[in-house]
């Protein structure tokens, strides 16, 4: 596995762990229920990033899938970090962090879709 892919797997693992921790914390009081959304987003995008890295290892254009994974992880970090900070500390990460993170996740998903489209027309690898 290349270094970039390995670092993305590390990032995804840490993101998934953070999602589980937030989900667990969210069960300890009604005031922490707002942690459910960032927890779910972290877990879902960690799994999606792992899948994108796995696909990249066999793809004809691996850079698209690695970029998609990075954008998904960076976006979910911003989005979930901002929503979690507002729930826990009543402070924002920085102005527009959640919308920037959400937009970054969307772009990551669209790049994954473009990667899938390019694989439809790629020469078979044997």
Where on the chain are the PLM-derived regions?
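Short, charged juxtamembrane terminal tails flanking transmembrane helices
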Residues: 1, 118-126
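N-terminal signal-anchor transmembrane alpha helix
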Residues: 4-28
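Hydrophobic alpha-helical transmembrane segments of polytopic
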Residues: 8, 12-16, 68-75, 101, ...
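Core segments of alpha-helical transmembrane spans in multipass integral membrane proteins
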Residues: 14-22, 34-58, 70-81
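Non-cytosolic membrane-interface motifs at loop->transmembrane helix junctions
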Residues: 33-40, 91-103
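Hydrophobic cores of alpha-helical transmembrane segments in multi-pass inner/ER membrane proteins
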Residues: 44-52, 104-115
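Juxtamembrane helix-break-helix junctions at the cytosolic face
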Residues: 53-65, 87-91, 122
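Membrane-helix boundary connector in multi-pass membrane proteins
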Residues: 82-97, 115
């Amino acid at each position: 596995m290349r270094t970039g892919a390995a670092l993305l797997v590390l990032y995804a693992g840490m993101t998934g762990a953070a999602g589980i921790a937030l989900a667990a914390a969210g069960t300890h009081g009604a005031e922490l229920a707002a942690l459910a959304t960032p927890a779910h987003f972290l877990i879902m995008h960690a799994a999606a990033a792992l899948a994108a890295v796995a696909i990249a290892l066999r793809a004809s254009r691996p850079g698209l899938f690695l970029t998609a994974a990075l954008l998904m992880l960076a976006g979910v970090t911003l989005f979930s970090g901002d929503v979690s900070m507002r729930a826990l500390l009543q402070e924002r990460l920085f102005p527009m962090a959640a919308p920037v993170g959400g937009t970054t996740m969307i772009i990551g998903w669209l790049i994954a879709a473009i990667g899938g489209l390019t694989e439809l027309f790629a020469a078979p690898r044997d």
